[in-house]
């Protein structure tokens, strides 16, 4: 829809050649919705700016409007309390649309292949090798494929004698890390009980052997670095997806979590979204929120999420994989990271007042 269709308008009459006080009561004033099917303003959370427009009968005539005082009679949050206004992240700062063909973009992604547990295993009892081959991760027809396969494969990542396993897959680390923003991923899950795909994040400071950031930023172990599972998909219910948080206060057993059932998780693309600000993390699928992580008393135990995190995409294989499994892929149409919220409470609290254009002729933006 065009941007103006989301507008809500309150009209006030003004008089000429004298001072007057004009009050806008956004809760009780009569309003006009440009899109009649949209919710009433008091029920919306996506309105993020106020535009004051002064119109004369002839908009081509030059009109000088004087504003002496501008007062907001209410509370503006600094974003550090649970009642604050959520920032709106609307500027694309990093993405991969996966429009090429062949190998992944090495400028954006790192293939993590070295096992993290004793140089042999991965977490959760996974039984696959991760490889950097295009057999397991590649781009085609506008999507990234992370392909888990049943095959005998020997890895020499740690042991010169080699370690042989019966499955292969891929685990990607983003070469981009960020603090706060919106992550949007359009993806389709693989088929099969025993496949364990995940779209998730780890703290850039994790000391994980073989990870992309460990050598340059690794100072903290897991779970103190903080883990954010944007979406995971496993188990007997193949249309169930879940988001979860791991940190010093709760890890391993997955205490902080929330999920929902969706239709056709493995046959249709769905949009998985994380909104991350200094106050909370909100998880949604196709625009429907299913989990919010928002500890009331944030501390180092439960909130290490004020530092950069990076993205990980992988498909693991669990021990309960069906014996007739051969291969299946997680497909990702795009991943996009947005930042630079349009509503900046620091700017509001600075009590700055800006008028465009200056001098004003027909329109004032505040």
What are these regions (language model features)?
Residues 17, 53-56, 72-342:
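GH16 jelly-roll
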Residues 44-51:
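Noncatalytic modules at the cell exterior or secretory-pathway interfaces
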Residues 12-13, 134-139, 355-357:
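Short, exposed beta-strand/loop patches in secreted or surface proteins that constitute
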Residues 10, 66, 94, 309, ...:
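Cysteine-rich, disulfide-stabilized extracellular repeat modules
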Residues 29, 103, 360:
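Hydrophobic pocket-lining residues within nucleotide cofactor-binding pockets
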Residues 1-38, 46, 57-66, 71-73, ...:
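Extracellular ligand-binding interfaces
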Residues 346-366:
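Surface-exposed, proline-anchored Ser/Thr-rich loop/turn motifs
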